Each structure stands twice: as C-alpha cells, then as structure tokens.
Regions:
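Positively charged n-region of N-terminal signal peptides that target proteins for export
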Residues: 1-6
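Scaffold/interface architecture of coatomer-like assemblies
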Residues: 25-313
Length: 313
C-alpha cells in the first residue's frame, strides 16, 4: 500500500499535472473564446441516442453552439472508486458486489481502487485495465471513525493529483457517509461548507465526474449528520455532472443496483465540445455551464461549471 502522492515520484510535478489535466492545469489564452470539451451523461428508462440538434448549451448564461458530440467509449474511460476507510466493518458484505462490478467493466476500462484516509487517497496500484488484479485490492475498511479527515479533502487531493496522464473520460465513485467534520455543526442551518465547494471546483477544473453512494461510517452518526452528508454528496454530484445513487436512513442492503446504474451512466456518456471564453487575467477560472436537451424522456447530467479550454486537444 502506498500514498497516492507516491505516484509522483521521479516526475516533475508540473510536467505530470500538465499531462494528467490536458489544459486545466496549463496556461490558456486569457481572453476570447477557446475550444472546450466536457463529459455529460444521459439518464433514460431505455437507452436512446442523444440527438445533438436538441441540445442547448449555455456558457455564462449565453447560448453557445454545440460544435461536436461524441459518445464516450467505455473502454477508453478511467474509473476511480474511492472508499472511506472509516466505513463500518459491515461494509465487508458489499465487497463481492464491488468486485463483480469491477470485473464486469468493458475490456480496456482503466480502474483504480483507493481508500480515503488522513485527507488523501491510498491505493495498492495505479489505474489498470487488469480488472481481476484491481478487484483483488478491494478490502474491508479499517473502520476507524473519522479516519478520512474529510472525504472532500481526499477528493480534492485525488483529482488534483490524478494518477494517470491518459486523456480518457474521468469518473469517480465515492463510497462514504459524506459528512464534513471540519464544517462544524451538521444542522440544517449549516449546510454551506467551503471544503465541499473547494472539492467540487477542483473536480470541475480536472474534468472529473463525481458520483456517490452514501454509506455510514463507524462513528455514531445519524439524523441531521446523515442528512448533511448525503446533501453534500448530492451537491458535488450535481456540480460535476455525476449522480448520487443512494440517500436513505440505513445503509443499502446491496450495492449491486447502484453499481449497475453507475455502469449505465458511464456507457451513456458523451463528450460535448463548444466554445467558452476565459476571463482576462484569470487562467484558472471556472465558467458557468448549463447543458440541457429537449429530447423527450431524456435527462442530461453535466457539470455546472467548466474550465475554458479544458479537454481540448
């Protein structure tokens, strides 16, 4: 086992980040429109091809032309499964479902399994298309309450240090209770966390779609804490074009149906290209984005903000 940061050994940090985040971590023109690409997914009862003629793209509140729409090939995608090391030991009954999910992914899909603790992510290996090997790295969490420090610290650290320079679409699935212990009270009156917002912005800059399945940790939490954590997970998912698959009082009996939904979301993902303007003098800024469709029976999940120039080759 080794810390994610270990993947950076032997590389110049700036060089690796430029490869991992094609444009988000690089300087781009600070004025005028630049080609920008983002990943979106389609939710429908039955798989239906997305009609580009019925898509509406708005950048900073202004309608912008969609220049291309290409279906993501799952075999080129990267899927990171981040497990909170503070989850209850009863999570062990879910391990078989998680292993089956990993081995069922399309040939070529690169998978990473990491454990969130102490504000970072620890994994046995980097991204790999050897699904059987990755599945073997899934283990029972340490079940130490609060060991992740904050799942949002872990998410921020991971997406900023994405351990691959591949240009494929990037997906994260978080398994955590979602509680941010550093934001004070979990009451309904205290649901604005700077750490959650920072994590979602980091994911948006890195072009990462973040989904989640809420699962209780080993600490004695419930009531407002459960609501708070699940609300934060939904917030991050909505902001990055992902989905929050389970919100409930008790832990899910099985992860299988939610993992199936996550697999379907990856299979029904597209790369959308359009022009977006970067703000003068702010090379690392985010621009408001809204993508919708008038196609009946379909719902589009897309990030709420994008880094102008991100994803462009």
């Amino acid at each position: 086992m080794h810390k994610l940061g270990g993947f950076l050994a032997g590389f110049a940090v700036a060089g690796l980040m430029a490869g991992a985040l094609p444009v988000a971590a690089q300087e781009i023109p600070n004025e005028g429109p630049v080609e920008t690409r983002t990943v979106l997914s389609v939710e429908a009862k039955q798989p239906v091809p997305l009609d580009p003629k019925q898509i509406k793209v708005e950048v900073n509140g202004r309608q912008t032309a969609l220049t291309s729409l290409t279906r993501i090939q799952p075999a080129t995608a990267q899927v990171a499964i981040l497990i909170d090391d503070g989850l209850r030991s009863s999570f062990g009954i879910q391990i078989d479902d998680l292993k089956k999910f990993i081995t069922s992914l399309p040939v070529g899909t690169q998978v990473f399994v990491g454990y969130m603790r102490n504000g970072g992510v620890t994994g046995a290996q980097g991204f790999s298309a050897d699904h059987a090997s990755v599945a073997k790295s899934v283990r029972i969490p340490l079940s130490a309450p609060g060991i992740s420090a904050s799942p949002y610290f872990c998410l921020s650290d991971f997406v900023k240090r994405w351990p691959s320079n591949s240009g494929g679409a990037r997906f994260v699935l978080m398994l955590t209770n979602g509680v941010d212990p550093y934001n004070g009270s979990t009451s309904l009156m205290n649901q604005t966390s700077p750490y959650v917002e920072a994590a979602q912005r980091d994911a948006q800059r890195a072009g990462v779609s973040v989904s989640a399945i809420a699962y209780a940790d080993a600490g004695v939490r419930g009531g407002s804490a459960s609501f708070s954590g699940q609300s934060y997970l939904q917030q991050v998912a909505d902001a990055t074009g992902g989905r929050s698959y389970y919100n409930g009082t008790f832990n899910p009996v099985s992860l299988s149906p939610y993992l199936d939904e996550f697999r379907s979301a990856i299979a029904e993902s597209y790369a959308a290209t359009f022009m977006a303007s970067a703000l003068r003098g702010k090379g690392n800024t985010l621009t408001r984005l809204k993508i919708s469709t008038s196609q009946k029976g379909l719902k589009v999940h897309a990030p709420e903000a994008v880094h102008p120039g991100s994803g462009a080759e």
